[in-house]
Amino acid sequence: MEAVFLLAKLPEAYQIFDPLVDVLPVIPVFFLALAFVWQAAVGFK
């Protein structure tokens, strides 16, 4: 179980990217929204 916590925490060298890593899982949702807006713009052809 401790290995899971070790893997969940970024190494110290990458701590500056910690806020970025928190945002990364949301990116596919933006692509889904973009696809919907694109289809709405072309009239769902």
Curated annotation (Swiss-Prot):
The keyword Cell cycle does not apply. One of its GO terms (cellular component) is plasma membrane-derived thylakoid membrane. It is found in: Cellular thylakoid membrane. InterPro entries: PSII_PsbK, PSII_PsbK_sf. Residues 1-8 form a propeptide. GO terms for biological process: photosynthesis. It comes from the Bacteria. The chain crosses the membrane at residues 24-44. It is a single-pass membrane protein. Keywords: Membrane, Photosynthesis, Photosystem II, Reaction center, Thylakoid, Transmembrane, Transmembrane helix. The keyword Thylakoid applies. NCBIfam families: PRK02553.1. One of the components of the core complex of photosystem II (PSII). PSII is a light-driven water:plastoquinone oxidoreductase that uses light energy to abstract electrons from H(2)O, generating O(2) and a proton gradient subsequently used for ATP formation. It consists of a core antenna complex that captures photons, and an electron transfer chain that converts photonic excitation into a charge separation. Belongs to the PsbK family. PSII is composed of 1 copy each of membrane proteins PsbA, PsbB, PsbC, PsbD, PsbE, PsbF, PsbH, PsbI, PsbJ, PsbK, PsbL, PsbM, PsbT, PsbX, PsbY, PsbZ, Psb30/Ycf12, peripheral proteins PsbO, CyanoQ (PsbQ), PsbU, PsbV and a large number of cofactors. It forms dimeric complexes. This is Photosystem II reaction center protein K. It comes from Crocosphaera subtropica (strain ATCC 51142 / BH68).
